[in-house]
Amino acid sequence: MNFETVIGLEVHVELKTNSKIFSSAPAHFGAEPNTNTTVVDLGMPGVLPVLNKRAVEFGMKAAMAINCEIAEHTKFDRKNYFYPDNPKAYQISQFDKPIGEHGWIEIEVGGKKKKIGITRLHLEEDAGKNTHTSHGYSLVDINRQGTPLIEIVSEPDIRSAEEAYAYLEKLKSIIQYTGVSDVKMEEGSMRCDANISIRPIGQEEFGVKTELKNLNSFNNVRKGIEYEEKRQAEVLKSGGIIEQETRRFEEATGKTSLMRIKEGSDDYRYFPEPDLVDLFIDDAWKERIRAEIPELPDKRQIRYINDLGLPAYDAMVLTLTKEMSDFFEATLAAGADAKQASNWLMGEVSAYLNAEQKELHETGLTPENLAGMIKLIEAGTISSKIAKKVFRELAQNGGDAEQLVKDKGLVQISDEGALRTIISEILDNNEQSIVDFKNGKDRAVGFLVGQVMKATKGQANPPMVNKLLLEEMNKR
């Protein structure tokens, strides 16, 4: 029996506000444990929450960016559960009246585009963080408690691990462009749970789903889904049944393990938050927030293709992160050719960032010095080979490309007289290569070009070397 996989993703994104959603405590990552907290976060008797307007506006902006309808009337609810990192024993969330509904984003997998529906986007507060020690006790940090979150719930439209990966990449890119979050999974500002079920191909009814947690990277989302597909298929083929449960992805083994039997919404005993009034969003407020949304990646891609003449693949890669796309645009503004700038950013720059595990702003590279280097290549001042050395120096230490080339003596040798002298000396010392060339062995030319480049430390103008080398050999 062959099965079809059905996947829905729940993505939590921390909003980049200065303070928490219901208290005045700072909402910044990385502080000492239990320093970013107030009596509201600790759930002390008699304290009242105050809604952070900026968090609401960030939620509206994110919802609009993923094509959600914004609610005119929304409210907050209490989600009741007990856990050490939840001092109040309830979480303030949204249940039946979320701030955004009925959205979608478009993904592309294997050259095919597909719309993935968004059921809802709602606001809520984050919980604290437990750290389990090897001494039999746990440490609780309340810093994260009360940090504003949006939860984005997809429709069960995803059919493979690859589609899930593409959805997360696209969602991260869109949220990043809006500026409402850093969406850094390594810092916990973007987290994902996956609901996975399988059903016989052709069956309309959904199978029993399992919820998968502890997915701390896009790769782990993919691996977790792939494992769970196989596990559920093996259970059904052996005559077993799938239980509705929550499972943990174990990164060390690549497998999933049981955490708990899955709760339903009734288990949380939702009821309206009595300490917060309902929220009404009028058209004027919506339009003001909509006007703040910048150009999003899909529109930017189209502009790069139509206005700059870039291939679709280049446009997609350049717009995947806002930092890269903004850097590209600033490089063009500094005078660089669009295709050359694209090639450098997608090639040498991306390779350097991956190898060094850095982001652009953490290097010495600027749009101005990258554009300056590209202009030196176009002017013939430096070769592409020398440009790679210049790039690494700029990336590591910054500075001006033209001044660096002068200081390091890296100017390309394009003087015909100087090159002829060098070529003549090399030909005098490699007479057999001349014989080989005249006998039709083209490899001899490559060898001699290499000797010239070696003698000039890679600074000779390659096209000119080829031209002069052929001229000099034909004279002999």
Swiss-Prot record:
GO terms for molecular function: asparaginyl-tRNA synthase (glutamine-hydrolyzing) activity; ATP binding; glutaminyl-tRNA synthase (glutamine-hydrolyzing) activity. Allows the formation of correctly charged Asn-tRNA(Asn) or Gln-tRNA(Gln) through the transamidation of misacylated Asp-tRNA(Asn) or Glu-tRNA(Gln) in organisms which lack either or both of asparaginyl-tRNA or glutaminyl-tRNA synthetases. The reaction takes place in the presence of glutamine and ATP through an activated phospho-Asp-tRNA(Asn) or phospho-Glu-tRNA(Gln). SMART domains: GatB_Yqey. PROSITE patterns: GATB. Heterotrimer of A, B and C subunits. The lineage of its organism: Bacteria, Bacillati, Bacillota, Bacilli, Bacillales. It catalyses: L-glutamyl-tRNA(Gln) + L-glutamine + ATP + H2O = L-glutaminyl-tRNA(Gln) + L-glutamate + ADP + phosphate + H(+); L-aspartyl-tRNA(Asn) + L-glutamine + ATP + H2O = L-asparaginyl-tRNA(Asn) + L-glutamate + ADP + phosphate + 2 H(+). It comes from Listeria monocytogenes serotype 4a (strain HCC23). InterPro entries: Asn/Gln-tRNA_amidoTrfase_suB/E, Asn/Gln-tRNA_Trfase_suB/E_cat, Asn/Gln_amidotransferase, Asn/Gln_tRNA_amidoTrase-B-like, GatB, GatB_C_1, GatB_Yqey_C_2, Gln-tRNA_amidoTrfase_suB_CS. Keywords: ATP-binding, Ligase, Nucleotide-binding, Protein biosynthesis. GO terms for biological process: glutaminyl-tRNAGln biosynthesis via transamidation; translation. It comes from the Bacteria. Its EC number is 6.3.5.-. Belongs to the GatB/GatE family. GatB subfamily. This is Aspartyl/glutamyl-tRNA(Asn/Gln) amidotransferase subunit B. HAMAP family: GatB.
